[in-house]
């Protein structure tokens, strides 16, 4: 499995709604609210044959209330 993170900027007043919809979709392993330019941080795992860009475009960015995303692809985990 390949891990990656997505920072999510929500429409005003929609962060809890987006977080709940993301949790209900059961596609993220972890979802956090954050301070700063983005409202949420979600961790995902996909199989090595899955295109991360298509996954984010099809499964994450289509959730109502999301205004913008930033995908962070990781290389090596030093601790878990």
What does each of the following model-derived ranges do?
Residues 1-80:
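A compositional/biophysical signature of low hydrophobicity enriched in polar/charged and small residues
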């Amino acid at each position: 499995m390949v891990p990656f993170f997505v920072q999510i900027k929500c429409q005003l007043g929609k962060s809890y709604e987006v977080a709940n919809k993301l949790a209900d979709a059961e596609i993220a392993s972890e979802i956090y609210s954050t301070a700063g330019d983005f409202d949420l941080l979600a961790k995902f795992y996909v199989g090595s044959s899955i295109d991360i860009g298509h996954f984010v475009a099809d499964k994450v960015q289509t959730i109502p209330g999301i205004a913008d995303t930033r995908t962070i692809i990781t290389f090596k985990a030093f601790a878990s």
